[in-house]
């Protein structure tokens, strides 16, 4: 159980907006204050102010070490998953998060279910969830400090299973193949499909979504989620049933571009080196770049690529709804210094 004494809580409240490095150098004059834990909380709250505003608004929340804060979902991406699950899961009685972590996604998704199971191997993170759950109004959760494979074997039928496999190996190095993530969802695939109608996998945006769809052979929707034009998450909706719309959805803030999953990337791609003066140059956002279906982009928005391998597009027409950045073409020049 996570406990902070009154002196430590007072120190956190009094110095919440101060520079953590300066506080560490200053130290404290009393042994009543757990300074390392206090600094962790101050740093966590400062990150949560922008990343997790609803958590930051609750004084009793206890935060994990900085690395966990950096790696956790933002409130924006967690809410996106919540909306996705509400569309796909018409019945929302039971859910299980088999890789609980800090619990941002779990606590967001659990709000819409009658019962939710949080599974996490790290005892410290389990203790944090035991403390933060009631603060967040979650009184219907079961916390299990166990390995997910063992829990999955004994788990009753669920309406939703959520998993966020770790994208680092035992040495802390990044991995970029689905089979290298832990837990290995490929080896658990059959059990997962038997245990839940909907399985939502959160993966690194660095993974090749085409390869993941091929390997799993049960993906019904793909969601590439970016915020601020930076890809944050790759979400795969899996099921043994024909649920969902079969699309790849590229999302960046309010921009959304979807296309059928089976679309060949460059089918319909139109190219031209002709540039219209006073026309417009278009650059797709990061999510669309990751999606890679530029032929569909040409068809939907009537743009042409500057080259077969170019990711810049032109059109004589201004399109406010293009999923990316727009520029008016004022002049055209070669790389000749005198022309420039």
Annotate each predicted stretch with a short phrase.
Residues 1-340:
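SAM-dependent transferase fold signal centered on methyltransferase-like domains
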């Amino acid at each position: 159980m996570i406990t902070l004494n009154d002196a430590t809580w007072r120190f956190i409240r009094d110095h919440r907006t101060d520079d953590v490095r300066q506080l560490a150098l200053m130290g404290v004059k009393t042994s009543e204050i757990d300074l390392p834990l206090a600094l962790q909380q101050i740093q966590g709250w400062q990150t949560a102010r922008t990343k997790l505003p609803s958590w930051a608004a609750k004084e009793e929340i206890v935060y994990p070490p900085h690395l966990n804060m950096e790696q956790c979902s933002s409130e924006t991406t967690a809410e996106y998953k919540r909306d996705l699950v509400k569309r796909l899961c018409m019945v929302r009685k039971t859910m299980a998060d088999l890789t609980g972590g800090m619990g941002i996604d779990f606590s967001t998704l659990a709000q819409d279910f009658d019962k939710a199971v949080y599974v996490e191997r790290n005892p410290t993170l389990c203790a944090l969830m035991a403390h933060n759950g009631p603060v967040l109004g979650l009184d219907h959760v079961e916390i299990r400090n166990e390995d997910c494979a063992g829990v999955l074997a004994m788990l009753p039928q669920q309406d939703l299973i959520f998993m966020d496999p770790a994208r680092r190996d035992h040495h802390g190095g990044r991995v970029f193949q689905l089979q290298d993530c832990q837990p290995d969802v490929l080896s658990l695939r059959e059990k997962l499909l038997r245990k839940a109608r909907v399985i939502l996998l959160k993966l690194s945006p660095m993974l090749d979504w085409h390869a993941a769809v091929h390997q799993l052979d049960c993906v019904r929707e793909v969601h590439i989620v970016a915020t601020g034009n930076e890809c944050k998450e790759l979400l795969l909706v899996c099921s043994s049933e024909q649920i969902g719309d079969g699309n790849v959805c590229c999302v960046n803030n309010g921009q959304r571009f979807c296309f059928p999953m089976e679309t060949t990337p460059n089918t319909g791609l139109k190219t031209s080196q002709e540039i219209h003066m006073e026309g417009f140059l278009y650059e797709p956002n990061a999510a669309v770049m990751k999606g890679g279906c530029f032929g569909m982009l040409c068809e939907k928005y009537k743009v042409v690529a500057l080259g077969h391998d170019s990711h810049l597009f032109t059109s004589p027409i201004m399109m406010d709804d293009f999923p990316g950045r727009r520029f008016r073409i004022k002049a055209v020049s070669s790389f000749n210094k005198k022309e420039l």
